[in-house]
Amino acid sequence: MTEFCAPKGVPDYVPPDSAQFVAVRDGLLTAARRAGYGHIELPIFEDTALFARGVGESTDVVSKEMYTFADRGDRSVTLRPEGTAGVVRAVIEHGLDRGALPVKLCYAGPFFRYERPQAGRYRQLQQVGVEAIGVDDPALDAEVIAIADAGFRSLGLDGFRLEVTSLGDETCRPQYRELLQEFLFGLDLDDDTRRRAALNPLRVLDDKRPEVRAMTAEAPVLLDHLSDVAKQHFDTVLAHLDALRVPYVINPRMVRGLDYYTKTTFEFVHDGLGAQSGIGGGGRYDGLMKQLGGQDLSGIGFGLGVDRTMLALRAEGKSVGESARCDVFGVPLSEQAKLTLAVLAGQLRASGVRVDLAYGDRGLKGAMRAADRSGARVALVAGDRDIEAGTVGVKDLGTGEQVSVSTDSVVDDVISKLGR
């Protein structure tokens, strides 16, 4: 066993899995960029208070899962557990909300939560996110949802479903809160769950314990108590999804794990992942900007799990991503040949050809075995005699045929053989 290993719940991605990781991440981002979303890079850690206030102190994320520590200046900082609060902070700090609205941003990277590691649920999780801030328009909600749907489908994933609901607005939420608390306080709940019911009763509906889920099965449903404005908003979102041909199912009992969600809320699930079936989700957060010290502007966004999407693709027997295999493998048999082939490799790479070289003193047989293992279609073979003659051996690794080609013509000859 090696002396050092990755921390528990923190995965490495090495070839060939890393190629799929990059393809999934970039595929999900591309769907957002095509809709006019600009890229934003966020700090890995932020002021702890940002997440406590933005995500919600009653959530499991803040109360149980954050990586929080004091830096050398005795400031409390936290490794980011999610992206929305950081994006909203950046929008306010840089005055992006003073320009054209909505502000459309996308991002990708690692996020950190102290959870029990299992398949698809890591302590360092990789996500792609989208945020649209500044416009309260159900058509924008539908666009954001459609971007996520298009991102998954662009990867060839099709065994997922979209679940949607509405968490209401400032008019109906307080009334529903009282109704839900009255129901919950009539149950035989443990002290910790009763505390959460008093602080934020929706958190109890998000409890994953079977005994709690059984007790709350008959809880009142927020969809049945929407205000006229919230109902109209939700109906319009659904109409737009229908027009965009984005299939969905309404899940009236969906509760997201973050406190800032209002109105439209959604989740993408894939049954091939077992209990941890979510591959992404999001919703509208109309009060978060003001809560974090900015203008009273609405927003909507999502976070899609790169790790979980990879598992979903695997469950469907699908793979994406360009492998690290090369097109051409150089076999230098002398120091001078090594220099010549390095120059040719640079010229071929500049033309978009993937080239690798044999390094070290492998000898011809060892180098050719490496060429075969590389997956290359063509090998360039040269020794001192070839260099003196101004030629390089170009070998088709499929047929075994080898011809001598003048050094000046090697690049064009190889590109022709590869059908480029």
Swiss-Prot record:
It comes from Mycobacterium marinum (strain ATCC BAA-535 / M). NCBIfam families: hisS (TIGR00442). GO terms for biological process: histidyl-tRNA aminoacylation. This is Histidine--tRNA ligase. Pfam families: HGTP_anticodon, tRNA-synt_His. One of its GO terms (cellular component) is cytoplasm. It comes from the Bacteria. Its EC number is 6.1.1.21. Keywords: Aminoacyl-tRNA synthetase, ATP-binding, Cytoplasm, Ligase, Nucleotide-binding, Protein biosynthesis. Its main location: cytoplasm. Homodimer.
